[in-house]
């Protein structure tokens, strides 16, 4: 799976679809995931003339101003990309409203009473009424009202009104004065209508309120749901039914998977997930919590897109081979200019441009630099960025007495210039989805000294060619590599030239070509799967004979009714019921017999890593070109022994027939007495 050759004809092959790129919201200080989504939206529009939608779910007071900023800064093109939101563009629009919010007081009237100020100001009497007070809090500009709190004469909060930066009232929260907790939230649209209510009840165990239910006053009448997830699914369903134009719903943010993939897919819709971050826990078989949904929906998805080949291969370790896996690496959000190689670099200067987050592990960069300074006292490290680890990093700088060598510089709006001036950059992350900062460095001819983490380190950095790849968490070797490169001008020159060449592989034309290839394959695979599925037929294969022989289970199936002309291979697979991890895979031994060797064919590591409790069995029929279709294995016409089988690996399996008549195993760990 390599980057594909570019041709003018291929560049124009992005399928004509509506593309929905889905994230929970639009953060104020967004990272690599949102940058990737925005750039994809921009390039699909500008380079391929395709409409894209950046779809967000979360209610956000500042969303409108954030969107304006994206357009004004050229992050997305208004001609092609729309940022749409569940509340702003669906719930508040398709409504008849519960009532008009008549209690509203004009902002100008409020400002006249309280005057202007940056912080909360209190009006002791509201329009002559002696039983109410109010306080006002402004946005950072000190002029625009963010919210207004209303208090009774006992100084108890009774209501809060929240406003956007444009002065629109959008949310009113009502408080129980006895509990000092909210009991009702009313959402207000541009027509001053209450279009949605959230109702809260007291939870004795949690000693706090919890959401009871939501009522949306839709055009079709009141719709009562238990949580926002149902509203999100309702919106996805609505978007699918708007027209028959093909649509790709591509989820970037893993917490959103459950809101999208559980919605029944219309014939014109495609579901996809793009993987931005490490999916495994303590070992490569253990699925991280936020990735469980994408694995459990694996056979419902039309595509899973990967930005590194290494992660694509690691996904296969869990799920087995999938014809829906595609490699679509990142690109650089600028034209590449070889003139960057002529910009003088400061010999003993390193730079890091990163979020100051724990997963970036920047403490190790500071520790390694303390070793560098012992060898090269004039060495400098500039760290640009902000985040929750600022104080920890600052303390490490002070503890290692590097205040004259390592500097926390805050945000930079010109990372290219910083990379061009630096001799090298350092990357010490625990893990990455790709390492966009490293790619930006390479595009400016800046060599990278990086830990060997998953994922992206070796995708971008070839050890000894355009930087150094260091054993992860080996601070001493990291420091030695930095020292070596700072002292060696000849190696630095070579690394710098090769850094730029590596960046060229991630050019815009190659980016579009990889997406064009993947998306057209996605469509072709679904067409071929549907054709092949019809040829195989709807009937589920059934067990005709089931025997257990020490460490082997022999299963004979009745496959006489299947068209063997189009079937090239038949396998028996056992999938973890919860996450669809492929636990067992064995080939047909003759016309009807499968044999499961408990020692060889059962992946105990996957069972242990994910605490597998039930394995469901399927027959997988393969056509040419890895196209496959699956059928659940039936056991309702066969009497199973009912005996449990103990493996030599500490597990007990118990075969049984499900309520639907299908064949499964219960799996339990054998506890030592």
UniProtKB/Swiss-Prot annotation:
Residue list for modification Phosphoserine: 2
Any single Gene Ontology cellular-component annotation: cytoplasm
Known catalytic reactions: 4-O-{[(2R)-1-glycerylphospho](n)-(2R)-1-glycerylphospho}-N-acetyl-beta-D-mannosaminyl-(1->4)-N-acetyl-alpha-D-glucosaminyl undecaprenyl diphosphate + n UDP-alpha-D-glucose = 4-O-{[(2R)-2-alpha-D-glucosyl-1-glycerylphospho](n)-(2R)-1-glycerylphospho}-N-acetyl-beta-D-mannosaminyl-(1->4)-N-acetyl-alpha-D-glucosaminyl undecaprenyl diphosphate + n UDP + n H(+)
CDD domains: GT4_GtfA-like
Database matches in Gene3D superfamilies: Glycogen Phosphorylase B
Signal peptide positions on this chain: none
Gene null: resulting phenotype: Not essential. No glucose groups on the glycerol residues of teichoic acid in cell walls.
Keyword entries, A-Z: Cell wall biogenesis/degradation, Cytoplasm, Glycosyltransferase, Phosphoprotein, Teichoic acid biosynthesis, Transferase
GO molecular function: poly(glycerol-phosphate) alpha-glucosyltransferase activity
Swiss-Prot/TrEMBL induction comment: Positively regulated by WalR. Mainly expressed during exponential growth and rapidly shut off as cells enter the stationary phase.
Xref: Pfam families: Glyco_trans_A_1, Glycos_transf_1
Listed EC numbers: 2.4.1.52
Subcellular location: Cytoplasm
GO biological process, one term: teichoic acid biosynthetic process
Broad EC category: transferase
Pathway: Cell wall biogenesis; poly(glycerol phosphate) teichoic acid biosynthesis
Family of the protein in this entry: Belongs to the glycosyltransferase group 1 family. Glycosyltransferase 4 subfamily.
Name used for this protein in its record: Poly(glycerol-phosphate) alpha-glucosyltransferase
Source organism of this protein record: Bacillus subtilis (strain 168)
